[in-house]
């Protein structure tokens, strides 16, 4: 029997928002959301825009609160922010006034690790993501792909049990995205963290994952979960195989009826900048 790292049972999420006429209305984002994530697996979640994929990840990260249901990590109810989880956002979430090395070390600093030790560890992960020579650079001096490498290194540096990734490669060009997908798999194969990965890309989900979960339109729930029985390590050429095409077709068949039927998203409170969420995750005081 597989060991379940994360268990969600009948999770629900509602919030107040403004409709197009500026009137308050209650938005039901998640309802009857059930999911079990196995320890050490790479699980991707697919779904139409606005179905609640990122909302569930934010609840799991402790950045949002469910309004019902049960959510457990390691067999214990999740209470707020879990320090054993790392989060990688689509928007990089780097602290703009910190160097690359200091950005990678920020989680260790929050945990009270001494300066010498945290910088030594940060250099190890800087090397792991292939950014030697950029330690003293600042985020604005890096390309999008390099910034996301720093974000991944930062999340891994304090050795979390679980890595939550919210469309981390969505804003990158196709070549950089495929390169970072392969890099992520290389790192995952070495460390075997439990990864929950949000994406809109069928190809990305299939290439990366052990299993793929497909969500319904809002209110979101898990419609189907299926295994990706493709050998590892996964090389780029895998995308051209008949087996890959088969899984892509299966994912699309599960998703097709949900796409296009998703309700329009009401206007909600403006989101925080991604680096402000990093501050919340660590209790890091940066004047926000």
Feature annotation, model-predicted:
Residues 61:
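Helix-to-loop junction immediately C-terminal to a conserved catalytic motif
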Residues 46-48:
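The feature captures the beta-strand-to-loop junction immediately N-terminal to the Walker
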């Amino acid at each position: 029997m597989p060991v379940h790292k994360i268990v969600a049972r009948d999770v629900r999420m509602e919030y107040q928002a403004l409709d197009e006429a500026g009137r308050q209305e209650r938005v039901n984002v998640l309802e009857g959301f059930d999911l079990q994530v196995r320890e050490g697996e790479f699980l991707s979640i697919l779904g139409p825009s606005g179905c609640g994929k990122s909302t569930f990840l934010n609840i799991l990260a402790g950045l949002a609160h469910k309004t019902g249901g049960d959510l457990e990590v390691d067999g214990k109810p999740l209470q707020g922010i879990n320090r054993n989880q790392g989060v990688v956002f689509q928007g990089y979430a780097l602290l703009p006034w910190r160097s690359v090395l200091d950005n990678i070390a920020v989680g260790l600093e929050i945990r009270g690790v001494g300066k010498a030790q945290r910088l030594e560890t940060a250099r190890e992960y800087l090397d792991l993501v292939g950014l030697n020579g950029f330690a003293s650079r600042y985020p604005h001096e890096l390309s999008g792909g390099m910034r996301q490498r720093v974000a991944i290194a930062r999340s891994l540096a304090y050795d979390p049990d679980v890595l939550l990734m919210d469309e981390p490669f969505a804003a990158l060009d196709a070549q950089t995205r495929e390169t970072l997908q392969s890099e992520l798999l290389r790192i995952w194969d070495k460390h075997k963290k439990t990864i929950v990965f949000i994406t809109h890309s069928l190809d990305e989900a299939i290439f990366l994952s052990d299993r793929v979960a497909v969500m319904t339109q809002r209110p979101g729930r898990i419609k189907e979960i299926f295994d990706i029985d493709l050998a590892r390590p996964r090389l780029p050429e895998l995308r051209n195989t008949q087996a890959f095409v088969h899984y892509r077709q299966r994912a699309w068949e599960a998703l097709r009826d949900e796409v296009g039927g998703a309700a329009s998203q009401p206007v909600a409170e403006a989101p925080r900048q991604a680096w402000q969420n990093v501050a919340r995750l660590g209790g890091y005081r940066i004047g926000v």
